[in-house]
Structure formats: C-alpha cells, structure tokens
C-alpha cells in the first residue's frame, strides 16, 4: 500500500462521528465544542499515523486478508476501529477478520468480544485454548507468566492465521511498546534490538504487522475512553506484573512529561541507523576498512560539539588551538 495513497485515505477518514451536535439537539456549549474539537484532532492524528505506518512499511496490499488480533484491551480495539475506517476509503481492497484467543482465564467475560464484533459487523473467530492451565502448571506461584503465555499464544495465532487464510497478522503494539523493548534489550539484554513494525514470523509462514507503531500510548488511552470500548482487564490470570517492562514504561512516561521530544527522538533513531558508527562487525566491514582519501559527510565531524575556531577567534580564551601534525617516518 503506497504511503501517499494511504495518507490521502487517512485524511478522508479522519472525521469523528460525534464531533458535532446531532440534528434536533441543543447547540454545543463552548466547553463541549472545545472537547469535540480536541477529540476530532486526536482521531485525525491517530488515523494519520496509522496510515503513515502502513504506507511506510507496505503493511497491507491489494487482496490481503488481515487477521486483527483482539485481546479486549485498548490497543487492539483502537487498531481494529481505525483499520475499519481506513478500509472504507482505501484505494485497494483488503479483508479484515478479528480473532480472539480465549485462554480460559478465570473470570474472562466470554460474551463481551462477540457482542462487540457483531455490533460493528466484523467477521470474527474465537479460538478456545486452555493455555491458562498449562501456564499455571509450569510456572511457580508468584512468578511472571507473561513470557510463556506469550509464546503459547503466538504459536496458536500463527496456526489460526493459516487456517483462516490470513496473509497478514496485525498486532496492537504502539510507539511506547517499541521504545520499551529497545530499552529492555539495551539495559538487560546487551543488544540494540527493538520491535519492528513489520516482520516475518518465527515459523517463516506469516507476516506480522504493527499498524499502531507510530501512535503514543497516551493517545490510545484517550481514544479508548472517547470510543467507550468494552475493555477487558489484562490481569485476570493473576500473574505478577513484568517489573522490568513496568520500569521502562514509567521511565518513558516521566521523560515525556519532563523532556518533551526525547522519546520521539529515541523512536526516530530506530529508523536512522549508521552502522559505521556502531560496533557490530557483521553490519560494517571494520576489519577491511581503509582510508579512501575522500571526505565522509557522516564522519566524526558530525559529532563535534561546536565548530573549530578560525581567524580572529583562534586567540580568544577557550578557543580551539591549531594542532601541529608531526610526521614520524620511522614508525
């Protein structure tokens, strides 16, 4: 799906249903008008960002059948909602099927998702698999079960995608999830690894996409409240929270408040990698590197804190002094 087309589609779709007072009702107050305006801005921003991500990474193509994985959380609800809006005006044809994995967690409200999906008119499939009992049997009480649960869920969803004939699997990870994963891998895994917007699945049979890759979590929280999605709690399994990921989430929230733009810069850095200025010998041929005699615009000069002084400035206090280069012929 080409980015320009998707952006046009996003612009066309970006009108919130209830942004104005319905006919026959009293005119909106100034406060209500302001809220409606802000809500419409939020919707337009999310739709634009989803459309841009889809276009940038060619996530959805003509004839695709997109399996939208719906957990009952705010992120997957928002992803489905926006994809449905975009599909209405997309320049290509693609199908959407919503899939939920009922893992038989105690207290899981089985009726919520089917009722919602019937209401919005989306084809859906509920996969019933008691992974909860497996996880409880294998993971000691009080430990985090998320990792094992995730692996089991992933394998089941890959199988279901094949059975349904889905060509793309859409997950609801957002910008904050991606940055959190980057930090977790750096701090605890010793590697530069994030969460890509598009990838081939572990089994090599599926393409996984993340249409919300450019969207902030705070925007999704506001959007879920605005759209009144029937949210299903994510702690029904009784698992202890992933403390390391919770730590990264709190760190990102704090940075967003105290240092606006910092998290965005970190996120943008994932798409602007300079292998010659890292240390991975598999990405850059350091061992065979030789001087070419030609200036490199991405060389070390890009990291100078300030330009070297010249002319009259050279003698100023604190100014950089010229360096004498001595030839050592006997070395």
UniProtKB/Swiss-Prot annotation:
- Identify the residue span(s) of motif PP-loop motif: 71-76
Subunit note:
Homodimer.
**Can you name this protein?**
tRNA-cytidine(32) 2-sulfurtransferase
Q: Which Gene3D superfamilies match?
A: HUPs
Q: Name the Gene Ontology molecular function terms of this record.
A: 4 iron, 4 sulfur cluster binding; ATP binding; magnesium ion binding; sulfurtransferase activity; tRNA binding
Q: What class of enzyme is it?
A: transferase
Question: Which CDD domains has this protein been placed in?
Answer: TtcA-like (cd24138)
**A Gene Ontology biological process annotation?**
tRNA thio-modification
Q: Which organism is it from?
A: Burkholderia orbicola (strain MC0-3)
- Tell me the name of the encoding gene: ttcA
User: Quick one: where is this thing mainly located?
Assistant: cytoplasm
Which pathway does the UniProt entry assign to this protein? tRNA modification
């Amino acid at each position: 799906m080409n980015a320009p087309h998707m952006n046009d589609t996003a612009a066309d779709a970006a009108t919130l249903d209830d942004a104005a007072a319905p006919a026959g009702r009293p005119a909106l107050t100034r406060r209500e008008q302001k809220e409606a305006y802000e809500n419409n801005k939020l919707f337009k921003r999310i739709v634009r960002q989803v459309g841009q991500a889809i276009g940038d990474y060619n996530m959805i193509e003509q004839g695709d059948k997109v399996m939208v994985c719906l957990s009952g959380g705010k992120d997957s609800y928002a992803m489905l909602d926006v994809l449905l809006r975009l599909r209405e005006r997309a320049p290509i044809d693609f199908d959407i099927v919503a899939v939920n994995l009922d893992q038989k967690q105690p207290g899981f409200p089985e009726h919520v998702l089917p009722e919602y999906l019937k209401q919005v008119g989306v084809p859906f499939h509920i996969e019933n698999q008691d992974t909860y009992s497996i996880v409880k049997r294998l993971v000691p009480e009080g430990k985090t079960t998320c990792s094992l649960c995730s692996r089991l869920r992933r394998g089941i969803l890959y199988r279901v995608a094949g059975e349904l004939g889905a060509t793309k699997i859409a997950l609801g990870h957002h910008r904050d999830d991606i940055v959190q994963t980057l930090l977790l891998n750096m701090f605890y895994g010793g590697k530069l690894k994030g969460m890509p917007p598009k990838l081939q699945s572990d089994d090599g049979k599926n393409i996984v996409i993340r249409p919300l890759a450019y969207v902030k979590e705070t925007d999704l929280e506001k959007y879920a409240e605005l759209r009144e999605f029937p949210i299903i709690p994510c702690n029904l399994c009784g698992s202890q929270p992933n403390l390391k990921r919770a730590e990264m989430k709190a760190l990102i929230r704090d940075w967003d408040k105290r240092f606006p733009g910092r998290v965005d810069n970190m996120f943008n850095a994932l798409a602007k990698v300079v292998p010659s200025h890292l240390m991975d010998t598999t990405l850059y041929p350091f061992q065979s590197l030789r001087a070419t005699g030609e200036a490199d615009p991405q060389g070390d000069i890009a990291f100078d804190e300030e330009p070297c002084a010249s002319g009259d400035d050279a003698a100023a206090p604190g100014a950089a002094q010229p360096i004498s280069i001595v030839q050592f012929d006997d070395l």
